[in-house]
Amino acid sequence: FASDMSIGRYTAQRAGIGINSGRIRGINSKIRGGEVAHTGVIPFLKKFEATVRCCTQNGVRGGSATVHFPFWHQEIEDILVLKNNKGTEDNRVRKLDYSIQLNKTMYERLLSQGKITLFSPKDVPGLYEAFFSDQDKFKELYEKYEKDSKIKKKTLSAMQLFSALIKERAETGRIYIMNVDHANTHSSFKDTVYMSNLCQEITLPTKPLQHIDDKEGEIALCILSAINVGILKDLDDMEELCDLAVRALDEIIDYQKYPVRAAELSTKARRSLGVGYIGLAHYLAKNQVKYGDKKALTLVHRLTEAFQYYLLKASVNLAKEKGACDNFYRTKYADGILPIDTYKKEVDEICNIKLQYDWEALRDEVKAHGLRHSTLSAQMPSESSSIVSNATNGIEPPRGFLSVKKSKKGPLKQIVPQYQSLQKYYTLLWDMPNNDGYINIVAVMQKFFDQAISGNWSYNPTHFDNNEVPMSVMLKDLLNTYKYGWKTSYYQNTYDYKSDGSVEEPQHSMGWHDNIKENPVEREDFKGTDEEYEEYCESCAI
């Protein structure tokens, strides 16, 4: 209940919310030796939904939240369908989004055509903690509890459960995925990461609150900025830009007000930052490279290496001036461990080029002087800032050369940068035959990023037989994102080829003309189709 109060306070401050509900017992679990039966997760989700929707943001919309659950939770079958249009108001909580947490054991059960066993977290001591912090221990405990006849459980086909996950993700566009093992092994923290944020780019430690003024609890905050890589002339220009971004965000940490004590103490002790990109599509087009080209991976590798290197260098320099953050000792950086040491090595199968910068000298500096910040990088959705900067949206391919964005203030037309000279080099989203190139680009970025990347899956049904995206294609993308180290998967976008005309057919001169809505909508039947929605939270607006 203290967490619910803090959610309300931050929603009132226009924040988007990440909630970890994975510890909540399953329905009908025994309380006080069976004296009381637990109500399960849905009543608590309805409470959270009411809290985030009761405060209007900018006088326009209610708040938003993403709730996280492990895939093996007793109620996962009911959780997966909470957003769809079937069912009743009693068993649906449509105005929240959901992130389903997976790990290696879950994927192994799928690949071996095995079973997945569901438990109430309270009935299986140690399993929830091990799920995030120790994969070998998790597997040992999971198999032990599967064999224990005294523990209440339910066993399902792994393919059946994964298919339900993919089906709901495809139909709603808003069932997200978090690979909790990658989020922790490729993390800058020694502390465990249990959840992400609203938009799935933040991976910071959290701790439940026992009361609203609890100093032992921990609320993680997103301190964000983005660099427009589309206008870079030279990679070494990153040095000044990264230094400026880091110094500006560092000042914000001390300047801003904190409505909850647990957020202030944690944020000031860890000083975690999340700097990302806008304009990646422009950057690739300037280099005459498409998203699916092998050369794109080399370009992104060099770009992101420079980006993370100079972010770390800026934080070291600030540590020399002001001192390392108080909780630096609780990071892997304190032991000289860098992102280049912990990334998923399968990335080398798709891009294996030599590092361009002197990482060993930087490692020595980090160990000697510390860092001012526990994290430096995160790739957020960036629709608003991309519009203001006249840049392409974050790392996304544009949906069209020209987009018309509608809001209460009227339509805004935006054309991709350098349209006349670069139009033949831009990759348009709905022209891509598959997600392979995009998945690989995000994987290469994740090699260097110390937090996560809001990566999307996008499908044009007209590229497939009978205008239907096969389940096998989506499962392949799920497995590839895991194989190449994605920490999270955000939206699933599907082109609405049956559009009533709000989206025109492809044209030779201006490509896809999207009807992009900025005004908030009630998206109970949202399918993430051809409409590119304005990011609807202030937490990821930069």
Which sequence ranges carry the predicted segments?
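Function-dense linear segments that define catalytic or interfacial modules
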Residues: F1-G33, V41-F44, C54-N58, E168-T267, ...
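Inter-helical turn/loop segments and adjacent helix faces that build the functional surface
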Residues: I31, C55-V67, K86-R92, T117, ...
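Catalytic alpha/beta core of large soluble enzyme barrels
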Residues: C199-K207, L249, I253-D254, C351-Q356, ...
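Internal maturation/activation junctions in enzymes
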Residues: C242-E264, K290-S382, S454
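Short acidic, low-complexity intrinsically disordered linear motifs used
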Residues: F526-I542
